[in-house]
Amino acid sequence: MSDFLNKRFWKYRGKRIRPYMRNNVKLAGAIIFVPVFLLSMFLFWREQLIHFDLSQVIKNFEWNVPLIIKSVLCSVLIAVGSIVASYFLLFDSYKKILHRQKIAKMIFSNKFYEKENVKVRKIFSNETDSKEKITYFPRMYYQVKNNHIYIRIAMDMSRFQNRFLDLGKDLENGLFCDLVDKQMEEGFVCFKLLYDVKKNRISIDDAVAENGVLPLMKHISWQFDKLPHMLIAGGTGGGKTYFMLTIIKACVGLGADVRILDPKNADLADLEEVLPKKVYSQKNGILMCLRKSVDGMMERMDEMKQMSNYKTGENYAYLGLKPVFIFFDEYVAFMDLLDMKERNEALSYMKQLVMLGRQAGYFLVLGAQRPDAKYLADGIRDQFSFRVSLGLMSDTGYGMMFGDVEKAYVNKKETGRGYANVGTGSVLEFYSPIVPKGYDFMSSIKNALVGVEGAQATAVASGSVSDQTASGEGVSEANG
């Protein structure tokens, strides 16, 4: 019913931007200052005003200089103090006023309006004077809803229409927001922006995977069942390793089969202590893990079709199977170590995993300093539905990660901060989950693993699931 009314009757699109709003902050200040100043002056002069007699004032007029100075100074200070207090107490309202002022100024500075000179008669005179009159001002609307800012611009077939469609980057930079989405509505283009993205950062304890969804920020989640495979890029000190460890912890807590490939034998390789026979650092071991993962995926797909509850279009989760996550860190460095035959073999395995893995529940998470197309050829890179860059990157690096998108990239020296493409086509500012100083990943992953194994043992003992289903595999795979 609401859709019917919205389509055929009036629909609220936000507060319309008017020409006077280019002085919005000054007007808001004056609206606070003037009443407070006058009220304060009245309180100082109330005795004189209550007993005011015009004839006596004219006859015995004298300047009460001390009271005048005192009242004016105090009233000004009180009015200014009211403005300052309003700024802090009503900061959100101030930001809205400032945003509307910036948009109005953008309209004037870019000359997105039309005007003409008209003749007007002077007051108290028969002479005429020329005055500018705005004959066209674009219909732009500003709305704040659910922590997002919506800027709607009417597509009215004016000569500015094509330029309106390309305002996303200007709005993003000018309002210091993150462009989340751009969509066409009936007669309008709508820019959806998020202000102060950092406020949506979550703790590592909140990054808990469930039902095919892993929350990474309050407004960003990796829906790995729908958007399979993740590509993570980031230089030294960008927070890439901690981010991968955070995802590993969440996947272990989910009960997934986690396999780790770390050719540099660095931080991820230390997880051998808590994930025995699941961590590979040598060339032969990594190639073997990739090969056996592909074989296991193919066998699982065949097994799924033989299951009694198999249904066309459903995935591994529908059949009660656990996902398999393969974390491959510094894969570019690994590829550089291989000869041509081995490199083609590794690329073939990776291509099969990313092309066929979603249905069977096999997910690949690649980490590198930058995703060189040399080692992600044949469209493999396009199969990574969720992409994250952390730390400082060049424009070339951003281009490799996200392609040619309308985005104003800003580098900030903050660990765990970067950008993400979450499968919507838009690149969003991103902050990885907060990891407290001194956080022990080894013990937390070990505890998560113990909890999962205990829950699986209980489920098997009760007969609610089979031993195969609890392990997440329909076939036996060697991990040696």
Curated annotation (Swiss-Prot):
What is the disulfide pattern of this chain? none
- Keywords per UniProt: ATP-binding, Cell membrane, Membrane, Nucleotide-binding, Transmembrane, Transmembrane helix
| Bilayer topology annotation | Multi-pass membrane protein
UniProt subcellular location: Cell membrane
Q: Report what the protein is called.
A: Ftsk domain-containing protein YdcQ
**Record-annotated residues binding ATP?**
234-241
Major subcellular location class:
membrane
Query: From which organism does this entry originate?
Result: Bacillus subtilis (strain 168)
